[in-house]
């Protein structure tokens, strides 16, 4: 499967990006990471901590996809597709995507269905994954789409 196959399946659309958009997305991910660290220091709930860390992951994944010239089509499964698309950037072997998908599902339960189900270990793990994904995405963009990053 390729990004173009995803376009044919109507999961993605081609859309150019530029360094301003990528810088904005990476700054947004950085902001969510700062908020995550503040939530940890302030002892906010593990649900809130995981939600902020997950947002940093999702935004970083969006930056990778946008740097490649694609965006997820609106209308359902946007977060799922954004995470799965990391296969075409930082995770071609799909080593971390299953973990990120579990975190996505955990975040969804905490956001939409129930509260207090996130453990400290899960929140901490999500925070570590967020830092990792953010760094790997920036490194990947610098290597593969240097014209899209300052």
Model-identified regions with their sequence ranges:
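Terminal alpha-helical segments
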Residues: 1-150
């Amino acid at each position: 499967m390729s990004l173009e196959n995803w376009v044919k399946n109507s999961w993605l659309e081609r859309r150019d990006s530029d360094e301003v958009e990528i810088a904005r997305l990476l700054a947004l991910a950085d902001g969510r990471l700062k908020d995550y660290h503040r939530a940890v220091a302030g002892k906010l709930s593990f649900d809130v901590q995981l939600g902020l860390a997950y947002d940093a992951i999702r935004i970083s994944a969006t930056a990778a996809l946008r740097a490649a010239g694609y965006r997820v089509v609106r209308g359902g499964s946007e977060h799922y597709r954004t995470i799965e698309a990391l296969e075409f950037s930082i995770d071609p072997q799909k080593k971390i995507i299953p973990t990120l998908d579990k975190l996505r599902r955990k975040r969804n339960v905490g956001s939409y269905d129930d509260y207090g189900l996130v453990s400290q270990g899960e929140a901490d793990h999500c925070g570590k994954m967020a830092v990792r994904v953010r760094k790997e995405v920036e490194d990947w963009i610098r290597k593969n789409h240097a014209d899209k990053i300052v």
